[in-house]
Swiss-Prot record:
Protein name in the entry: Protein SYS1 homolog
InterPro entries in the cross-refs: Integral_membrane_SYS1, Integral_membrane_SYS1-rel
Keywords: Golgi apparatus, Membrane, Protein transport, Transmembrane, Transmembrane helix, Transport
Locations listed in the record: Golgi apparatus membrane
Primary role: Involved in protein trafficking.
GO biological process, one term: protein localization to Golgi apparatus
Length: 157
C-alpha cells in the first residue's frame, strides 16, 4: 500500500477509547447543564432528568429548561468531537453512537421512550452536535499547512 495523505488505519482500541471519551463527556457536560437548570428551576437532582422521557414535559418550565440543557449539551458535545475525534468525516458516526448508547441507557432505566417530545429533542440534538462538530473539525482540517522551504544560509551543502 502506497503512503498517502491521512491514510486510514483500522485501530479498534483508538475507536473504542474515543467512543468512551465522547460518552463520558456527553454525560458529564449534560450533568453540568442539568445542574444549572436545577439551580434556576429549583428542582431536585435526579437521574430521571437524564434518562426518563417523562421529565421532558413541554408544558412545564422545568421540562423546557431541561430541553434547553440537552440542546446546550449538543454544543458541548460538538466541542468534544473537535477535541477528541478531530475529523469531520467521523463526527456523524460518533454523534450517532453517543445518542444510540443514550437511547439504550434510557430504555434500561425507564423503558422505551414513547414520547414524541423525547424523540424530536434527541433528533434535533443529534443533528446539532453532528453539524456543529463537523463544522469546527472542518475549519481545523482546512487550515493552511505551513511548509518550511528548507535550510538557507551558511550550512547548506
Amino acid at each position: 500500500m502506497a503512503a498517502g495523505f491521512r491514510t486510514n488505519v483500522w485501530d479498534p482500541v483508538l475507536i473504542i477509547s474515543q467512543i468512551i471519551a465522547i460518552q463520558c463527556t456527553f454525560y458529564i457536560s449534560l450533568g453540568v447543564w442539568v445542574l444549572i437548570v436545577d439551580y434556576w428551576s429549583g428542582s431536585i437532582h435526579s437521574l430521571d432528568q437524564f434518562f426518563a422521557y417523562k421529565e421532558l414535559d413541554i408544558s412545564s418550565l422545568k421540562g423546557k429548561l431541561l430541553m434547553i440543557a440537552f440542546c446546550l449539551n449538543s454544543l458541548t458535545g460538538a466541542m468534544a468531537l473537535w477535541f477528541i475525534v478531530k475529523r469531520a468525516k467521523q463526527c456523524l458516526d460518533f454523534t450517532t453512537t453517543a445518542h444510540i448508547v443514550h437511547l439504550v441507557f434510557c430504555c434500561i432505566y425507564a423503558g422505551f421512550p414513547f414520547s414524541w417530545t423525547w424523540w424530536l429533542l434527541n433528533i434535533i440534538c443529534l443533528a446539532l452536535m453532528a453539524v456543529i462538530g463537523e463544522f469546527v473539525c472542518m475549519k481545523t482540517e482546512l487550515k493552511a499547512i505551513k511548509v518550511s522551504a528548507g535550510s538557507s544560509g551558511k550550512n547548506s551543502v
